[in-house]
Amino acid sequence: MQEQYNPQDIEHKVQQHWDNNKTFVVSEDPNKEKFYCLSMFPYPSGRLHMGHVRNYTIGDVVSRFQRLQGKNVLQPIGWDAFGLPAENAAVKNNTAPAPWTYENIEYMKNQLKLLGFGYDWNREFATCRPEYYRWEQEFFTKLFAKGLVYKKTSSVNWCPNDQTVLANEQVEDGCCWRCDTPVEQKEIPQWFIKITAYAQELLDDLDNLDGWPEMVKTMQRNWIGRSEGVELKFAVKGENTDLEVYTTRPDTLMGVTYVGIAAGHPLATKAAANNPALAAFIDECKNTKVAEAEIATMEKKGMATGLTAIHPLNGREVPIYIANFVLMDYGTGAVMAVPAHDQRDFEFATKYGLDIIPVIKPADGSELDVSEAAYTEKGVLFASGEFDGLDFQAAFNAIAAKLEAEGKGKKTVNFRLRDWGVSRQRYWGAPIPMVTTEDGQVHPVPADQLPVILPEDVVMDGVTSPIKADKEWAKTTFNGEPALRETDTFDTFMESSWYYARYCSPQADDILDPEKANYWLPVDQYIGGIEHACMHLLYSRFFHKLLRDAGYVKSDEPFKKLLCQGMVLADAFYYTNDKGGKEWVSPTEVKVERDGKGRIVSAVDATGRQVEHSGMIKMSKSKNNGIDPQEMVDKYGADTVRLFMMFASPADMTLEWQESGVEGANRFLRRVWKLVREHTELGQAPALDASALNADQKALRRDVHKTIAKVTDDVARRQTFNTAIAAIMELMNKLTKAPMTEAQDRAILDEALKAITLMLYPITPHICFEMWVALGQSNIDTASWPTYDEAALVEDEKLIVLQVNGKLRGKLTVAADATQQQVEALGMQDENVQKFIDGLTVRKVIYVPGKLLNIVAN
């Protein structure tokens, strides 16, 4: 071993060894238990950031730990390579998205290798390559044949100046990010996949995901949003049509005082035909795109249509209003409004002077007051005719039954979940494999004509998609007839919804090789951010069920266990510029002064200017507080960066980046290196003889095996990697202080250092690879995780706490197998106990075996 720990030399050498020996390349082995560990694959943005490093370090620790358990471990990597940022970067750098993407992949691949992640690089792919998306295109045509794909008009953000569709993130304060033109809402035909056909199964199967965080499952349950209610019809006076509404509160039906409809509802269009003011209001609503989440807080606006709805049970006439809080995309685009029992309806009714009729009162008989706010609790019906006195459930059933008997409604189950719109009016995505013939018929592209290849040699003007601008690209034939290609591309969530499955057989001449897929799937451990809870994780679950129903996989779910890593935070600093805006300064350019408690009291940048400390916030480009992993690896080595990432915080909590912590991790590795070097320089250690150990040696060996037991549980079951590292550090402190005068002292140290090297290997594999060889072993990559010796954990002695009347009066060391009588006798003889019971009568003695003796006396 070199005298000094030199991470750069070691890491380069060990990484060469892994590459040359294809250490992490795996294949199916029916004789070995498999373990598939996957971290969410990166978008090739150009450089890795610390969030990536944290995610991939956790994945590598889990993978290497499972390898040491003797399992056949698959840990693949690839690139989520389509998407809008590549288009933006291409315009900015005057290039095309493809070369920009491929350059980034090469650079980031090198960065991943420098961090020592044990990937099977033979399985690497980029989703922007035709050999990947070709199978996605074919699967889409199969879903179309099954009736699970359809086309309908849907609203998009439209820039009238550029004549182009904008993604939500390209709309800034209601205007186009490029030309500042007010954005409009435009209805265009788009492709959808029927995820709603699987809504109930997606909901039910969450109960089987024991290895998922409860929070993610709750988020998905809410997103799917199953509710039981009643679908009912309001006739429209003077019109030969009905308004269909869905309600989860049919018990409030007798309190309806108006009906709200969406601006996009056909009835709204009809009412506005001869009403310019109404038409203008509809345009205003349509051009204010509202996310469902914003409805609760936005100002409620409406306008009367002049139309009247007829109550289905009591025949009361109620006005029909267009309301900006009713969305066409949700439910039927119409709602029955009960201002007395719904706060949103109450605010609207108060604003427009509409009736507020209470029909539910508290079940406990307390006074009902709807003068200031709606009463939204469930209670007992009144002013509801034949339904008076019924509670919620009884009223629900009775009103539903009456509506059904009269052909005006029925009980139904509703889902908040909407079908998945997969059309994007962008260039850098997989072309949707559909064509339209001259007779207007839409057809899937036949399998023998796939893939529909996205041309990569294009010029980006920053406005129109090159495949929309190039009229020749769309021209094709179908069965010998002229046809036009679909020029929309797939939502990039399509690629990320099945990539985990493609890794099982990346060269397969089909979307999957079922035999290989069923060996590896489901993924045993998936790692990624909680921000993907409702989109990517739900779409992947859906896609897996589609693959199952197409006969490719046997499992119902793609991911057994899910770990959502916390964000990486760093100090952020700024100064205020002449225009009053914030200019963010990189923490690497800031000198800080701290008080006695470590709080920042003063900060100046490289020019000497005072800067404000904004606190510890998520690392991001916009706040200029990202720390480049490359710089840290160059300065301290990959093992140090990995160790800090795993030690600084529990994996699922936020991690505060502190370079002092990185320095601490580096010092610890140097201490381990030094102890191993000093130990190995003395030559081979004598054999361990457990029967020849004295009490101190037994205690130290017990600590070694307690640590093995704790670290094993922390890593395998609890996934509290930080406490596992803390336990190893504690053991290191004890070993450093332990005497090394006898042969058995060295034997215990040898056993301990081998265990520490194996336990640190998943976290800091390069240094452990070297130390393992120095300790006289062969290849740590194929070694086994240490097991603790039950016999070593057995204690010869126990420490008993002595109490008199519940107060601590002393401690007593007894043989581990001492009886209660022996402990009582020794306890009574204790000098301090004698002092406190002198002159008193012992009433009883309470003994907690092996822990405590309490003498009750008065």
Swiss-Prot record:
SUPFAM superfamilies: Anticodon-binding domain of a subclass of class I aminoacyl-tRNA synthetases (SSF47323), Nucleotidylyl transferase (SSF52374), ValRS/IleRS/LeuRS editing domain (SSF50677). Its EC number is 6.1.1.4. GO terms for cellular component: cytosol. The keyword Flavoprotein does not apply. Keywords: Aminoacyl-tRNA synthetase, ATP-binding, Cytoplasm, Ligase, Nucleotide-binding, Protein biosynthesis. It is found in: Cytoplasm. NCBIfam families: leuS_bact (TIGR00396). PANTHER family: LEUCINE--TRNA LIGASE, MITOCHONDRIAL, LEUCYL-TRNA SYNTHETASE. Belongs to the class-I aminoacyl-tRNA synthetase family. This is Leucine--tRNA ligase. It comes from Vibrio cholerae serotype O1 (strain ATCC 39315 / El Tor Inaba N16961). The gene is leuS.
